[in-house]
């Protein structure tokens, strides 16, 4: 793991708007920070057919995701558009303090990062803040587990966070047994030491070997 970065791992980035989250991360997301959103977990149809409209300042996607950061007084909020020249995409990443991986599909996110030559670039980033939602949070991990039709699959991620393995969108009433199975599988198949269930109203802050729970997080 790159211990020089700080990682905020969420199930739902809307939690950033919650007072509980704000109190937990306000000393990390500092005023005048510059944020770049990498939306590559979205469907290809959305990315390649609607991005010009949705990612502009007046677009619904832009407004929805910028809203998460408004109370932190960030100075700039960019979204990487797949139609951007690669040099401009890399400039946005280099120029910003915060890399925000929005949610969607893990495999699409990995495919797009590799297709645009960003997989290795992101792995080399140091001294930045990563905020990752759902699919983004899973892909940051060394390894992650997903369930499809109640069948578990282990997948490889970016290997930027190698001490936690998270179960996203956890609902205590619905997922208690599944999380128990998840923990057993994680202990057997993944190298991460700590396993957490993160609800839509919770998140983890990972700084080196220090893990801080914010909101509704279970272990």
Locate the predicted segments by residue.
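Short His-Asn-centered micro-motif
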Residues: 101-103, 112, 133
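Active-site-adjacent pocket-lining segments in enzyme domains
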Residues: 110-129, 136-219
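Extended, subdomain-level signal for the structured scaffold at the beginning of enzyme domains
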Residues: 1-94, 98-107, 192-197, 201-219
């Amino acid at each position: 793991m790159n211990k020089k970065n700080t990682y905020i791992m969420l199930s739902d980035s809307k939690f950033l708007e919650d007072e509980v989250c704000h109190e937990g991360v306000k000393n990390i997301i500092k005023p005048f920070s510059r944020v770049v959103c990498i939306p590559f977990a979205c469907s290809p149809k959305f990315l390649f057919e609607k991005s010009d409209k949705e990612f502009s300042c007046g677009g619904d996607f832009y407004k929805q995701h910028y809203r998460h950061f408004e109370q932190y007084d960030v100075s700039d909020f960019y979204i990487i558009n797949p139609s951007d020249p690669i040099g401009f995409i890399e400039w946005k990443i280099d120029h910003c303090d915060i890399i925000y991986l929005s949610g969607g599909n893990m495999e699409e996110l990995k495919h797009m990062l590799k297709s645009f030559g960003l997989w290795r670039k992101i792995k080399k980033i140091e001294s930045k803040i990563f905020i990752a939602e759902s699919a983004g949070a899973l892909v940051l991990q060394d390894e992650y587990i997903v369930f499809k039709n109640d069948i578990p699959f282990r997948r490889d991620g970016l290997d930027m966070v190698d001490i936690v393995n998270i179960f996203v969108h956890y609902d205590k009433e619905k997922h208690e047994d599944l999380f128990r199975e998840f923990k057993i599988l994680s202990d057997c198949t993944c190298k991460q030491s700590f396993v957490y269930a993160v609800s839509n109203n919770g998140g983890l802050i990972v700084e080196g070997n220090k893990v801080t729970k914010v909101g509704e997080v279970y272990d």
